[in-house]
């Protein structure tokens, strides 16, 4: 077997549709587009969600919910993210330096998710009751 002797399996490749090549090809004249109408024209077609003039579904349904602006500058981090910080002191700046949070985050809350093995000192971050218990059980502490 050589590279120049390789070929696809029989029937694995279909030949391309050759449109507008005579009546007997089956794809001559209208080229598989049918007669007249918007979809037969060059550049013809309708946008996504268009229902022929009927009020489309996305406009029939009501709007709901909103995006809280708080979500743009408040982050929740897991216990196992605390281990990614160099040293044993975890602050907002040290989390940014370790790429755990983005630079536009202004406040952080540590939640009880994942595990923590090393003892860390958490400074100036929000901590849930469960996360506080887990940090203290690992030998760490929380400072406001």
From Swiss-Prot:
Keywords: Ribonucleoprotein, Ribosomal protein, RNA-binding, rRNA-binding. Residues 1-52 are annotated as: Disordered. GO terms for biological process: translation. InterPro entries: Ribosomal_uL15, Ribosomal_uL15/eL18, Ribosomal_uL15/eL18_sf, Ribosomal_uL15_bac-type, Ribosomal_uL15_CS. One of its GO terms (molecular function) is structural constituent of ribosome. Disulfide bonds: none annotated. GO terms for cellular component: cytosolic large ribosomal subunit. NCBIfam families: rplO_bact. Binds to the 23S rRNA. Part of the 50S ribosomal subunit. Belongs to the universal ribosomal protein uL15 family. This is Large ribosomal subunit protein uL15. It comes from Actinobacillus pleuropneumoniae serotype 7 (strain AP76). The gene is rplO.
């Amino acid at each position: 077997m050589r590279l120049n002797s390789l070929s696809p399996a029989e029937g694995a490749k279909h030949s391309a549709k050759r449109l507008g090549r005579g009546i007997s090809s089956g794809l001559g004249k209208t080229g598989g587009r049918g007669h007249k109408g918007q979809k037969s024209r060059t550049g013809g077609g309708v946008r996504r969600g268009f229902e022929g003039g009927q009020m489309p579904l996305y406009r029939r349904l009501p709007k709901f919910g909103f995006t809280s602006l708080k979500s743009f500058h408040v982050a929740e981090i897991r216990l196992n993210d605390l281990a990614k910080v160099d040293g044993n002191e975890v602050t907002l700046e040290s989390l940014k330096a370790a790429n755990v949070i983005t630079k536009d985050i202004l406040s952080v809350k540590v939640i009880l998710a994942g595990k923590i093995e090393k003892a860390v000192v958490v400074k100036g971050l929000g901590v849930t009751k469960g996360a506080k218990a887990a940090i203290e059980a690992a030998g760490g502490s929380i400072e406001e």
